[in-house]
Amino acid sequence: MLAQKRSFQSIAKSLGRYTSTISREIAAGSCNKYTYRANKAQARAIRNSHKRRAGRYDLDDNLRLKRYVYRKLRLKWSTTQIAKTLEKDYPTDIGMRISPESIYTYLFVLPKGTLKKELLACLRQNRKHRRKQRRGVEAKRKLEDMLSIEECPKEVEDRIIPGHWEGDLIVGKNNRSALGTLVERTTRTTILIPVKSKSATDVAKAFAREVKKLPKQMRLTMTYNQGREMASHKLFTKITGVKVYFANPRSPWERGTNENTNGLIRQYFPKGTDFTKVSRYEVKRAQHQLNGRPRKTLDYQTPYEVFDKLINS
């Protein structure tokens, strides 16, 4: 068509394309106004595609960086955690740098296969809204002798003094199994607790068993929702000496640290997990990995690092 000296408008009309599209394509593959080389345009398209895919850094060109990124992804670190920790681990090595966006870009353009599937599964599921965890009609009944969150010491809200925890249960398949979760508000240290059942007595004893292992200065308070599984809170307090305060109904933000952490835990135990089939080893491995992740809110230190500094200071 160009050889026939037809205009861009005429070519666009014949091909059912916009004139601007024809103009850009010819500009990309032309030697002059009236010659178009499809192979030249294709080669340029491939080069541009590679640049877009590679992002600022191409991990395939830096094996050491690639191994580092893969290793941390398999520990379920976020791309931001990886990028920030690289700066700490290699402060003078510019070659060991990559942005979070470049990691995402690299992963999503990997060829389809087992490796891509494995690495993408390590990324967090960024839902816009987290579903409320319903406790049923029983959750609306007030627990006997419960202390309201309004009565909490002010130091709990300030997060300056460690030893204040938030607790919850992650419910498993068919609402028949569960995993207890505890998160320390200052250090973000997480404890995962296998429970025999969701009965109040079993939950209180399981939580107490783990809390008793903590240094005394790290056992001050616990904030929980008004679920019936914590109806034996007085038994828990008797065993541990830790007072339990209860958040208001339908107010997950009052235990925001725990709610956020439950989302992270779902990376290891997705919704629908049957916790009766999850071994204690699997639970503790997930706990270890969670506490070994650098956190933005901790200036990219890990919960383990901050916890150890506080109890040894």
Regions found by a protein language model. Name each.
Residues 4, 14, 66-75, 85, ...:
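Charged alpha-helix within mobile-element recombinases
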Residues 4-80, 84-92:
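Short, basic alpha-helical/linker "hinge" immediately adjacent to a nucleic-acid-recognition surface
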Residues 6-7, 187-191, 214-219, 269:
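Short, surface-exposed connector motifs at secondary-structure boundaries
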Residues 17, 74-135:
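Conserved short alpha-helical interface segments
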Residues 22-25, 69, 82, 103, ...:
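Mobile genetic element proteins and their domesticated derivatives, centered on retroelements
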Residues 171-175, 192-216:
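Active-site beta-loop-alpha junctions of metal-dependent nucleic acid enzymes
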Residues 218-231:
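Acidic/histidine-rich, metal-coordinating catalytic segments
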